[in-house]
């Protein structure tokens, strides 16, 4: 199987359903939803992402959810660098990715049968 076929298979078999589930979680940013902790949507989103990532077979990967009172959780995923580098130090291959799990408030104007928390794939 070539790289493009592998990516398509992983996308279709492992990612699309997770995205659909994520879309259904009305996890509004705490900047717009004072009751975000009480509602529990952030916890559902964190669990979804944490569990999906934990299911990947990546050597040496560790996953930790860090929490501070009154703040949104932080998922820290550490994957050690490996392989040769020009300096011989794998630590030179550090990459940092950052993202967030909260969403902006929903807007109006959706077509019939569509909405911000309803995943739809249109061909």
Q: Where in this protein do the model-derived segments appear?
A:
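N-terminal capping segment at the start of a domain
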Residues: 2-40
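Intrinsically disordered, low-complexity segments enriched in polar/charged residues with Gly/Pro
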Residues: 8, 15, 50-51, 62-65, ...
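A non-catalytic alpha/beta surface segment that caps or lines the substrate-entry region
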Residues: 32-92, 115-119
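Short hydrophobic/aromatic-rich motifs at helix boundaries and adjacent loops
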Residues: 17-24, 82, 116-121
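Active-site metal-coordination/substrate-binding segment of hydrolases
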Residues: 85-123
């Amino acid at each position: 199987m070539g790289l493009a076929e592998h990516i398509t298979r992983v996308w279709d078999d492992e990612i699309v359903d997770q995205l659909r589930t994520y879309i259904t979680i009305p996890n509004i940013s705490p900047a717009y939803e004072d009751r975000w902790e009480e509602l529990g949507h952030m916890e559902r989103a964190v669990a979804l992402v944490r569990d999906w990532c934990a299911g990947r077979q990546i050597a040496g990967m560790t996953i930790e959810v860090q929490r501070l009172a009154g703040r949104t959780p932080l998922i820290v995923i550490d994957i050690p660098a490996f392989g040769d580098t020009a300096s011989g130090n794998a630590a030179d291959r550090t990459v940092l990715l950052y993202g967030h799990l909260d969403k902006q408030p929903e807007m109006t104007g959706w077509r019939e049968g569509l909405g911000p928390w309803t995943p739809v794939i249109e061909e």
